[in-house]
């Protein structure tokens, strides 16, 4: 039986490219090589596509994907050269130019099935401000927030924010993930600095009320029919869950499943599934919640391409549900082909 080609796109132009490499390396080791041939392409920070490695069997633990330090520029290709009839693409890309609809639109133009949400849901979910407004409109609880857009009156924004929110306040670039560019402010001076830092990553800034809460996450899988996992909890040894804590200092542990009341589990899974459908989701996502001491649930964000390393929450949540990492990848390929066929049928 011939193997299906799985194309891994990794790296990318965003500040989250290092996470992308870690996720892609985990995927390349977990794939069932009885069924798949894996071809990998690295996207540089400048947006160049580089043909890297090909795997017909499981690579050794010491094998690493090529990155900026090891790529051969002679292997630079036109982006459209990744096309292969019958192949499915796994864009293991995080952040802007990865999970914001850009690469999804490119793959749709190429007529290649791809894992993950479509152009619309990717672009909406990537923007924290737009996501909040959509979820508010369907009654899913959100923490209080204000918004600053580059070029607006910063002083007026500070006045509005301090009238509506109390310290601590969290400031986030609207279109970044993996906690990149996020700051916690305890004073007006810190708030101003936090907004200025966020503006180095994005022109749109979300300013949120800090809440004392547990961080609970739910995995989602499916197209028209979506399944959700039991929730898992992020347990922090730090003040807040930033990029350094997540990926450098290893100060994050997880409890799977999370120790929460059944009524809360039901509420979170329902909110997650409703949010996924409201944003037009397909394939996969991870819903991140805050759970306060008095039992209030807030949906913080919906991540359309969650971290995919072997120690990431999303694959571990599904493993807890009885779906092993290799089988999860296979299911995602099936869902990608299904949504591709559906999309193509509407264009005839």
Swiss-Prot record:
Pathways per UniProt: Cell wall biogenesis; peptidoglycan biosynthesis
Single Gene Ontology MF annotation: metal ion binding
Cell wall biogenesis/degradation keyword on record: yes
Ranges in coiled-coil conformation: none
UniProt: Mg(2+) 2 binding residues: 301, 303
Ranges where the ATP-grasp domain occurs: 132-334
Cofactor(s) listed: Mg(2+); Mn(2+)
This protein's record includes keyword Cell wall biogenesis/degradation: yes
InterPro entries the UniProt entry points to: ATP-grasp, ATP_grasp_subdomain_1, D-Ala_lig_Van_CS, D_ala_D_ala, Dala_Dala_lig_C, Dala_Dala_lig_N, PreATP-grasp_dom_sf
Cofactor note: Binds 2 magnesium or manganese ions per subunit.
Reactions mediated catalytically: 2 D-alanine + ATP = D-alanyl-D-alanine + ADP + phosphate + H(+)
Subcellular location: Cytoplasm
Pfam families, per database record: Dala_Dala_lig_C, Dala_Dala_lig_N
Keywords associated with the record: ATP-binding, Cell shape, Cell wall biogenesis/degradation, Cytoplasm, Ligase, Magnesium, Manganese, Metal-binding, Nucleotide-binding, Peptidoglycan synthesis
Major subcellular location class: cytoplasm
GO cellular component, one term: cytosol
Gene3D superfamilies (UniProt xref): 3.40.50.20, ATP-grasp fold, A domain, ATP-grasp fold, B domain
Record-listed E.C. numbers: 6.3.2.4
Binding residue positions for ATP: 162-217
Residues annotated for Mg(2+) 1 binding in this entry: 288, 301
Function field: Cell wall formation.
Listed HAMAP family: Dala_Dala_lig
Family per record: Belongs to the D-alanine--D-alanine ligase family.
PANTHER family membership: D-ALANINE--D-ALANINE LIGASE (PTHR23132), D-ALANINE--D-ALANINE LIGASE A (PTHR23132:SF25)
Name used for this protein in its record: D-alanine--D-alanine ligase
Organism encoding this protein: Streptococcus pyogenes serotype M6 (strain ATCC BAA-946 / MGAS10394)
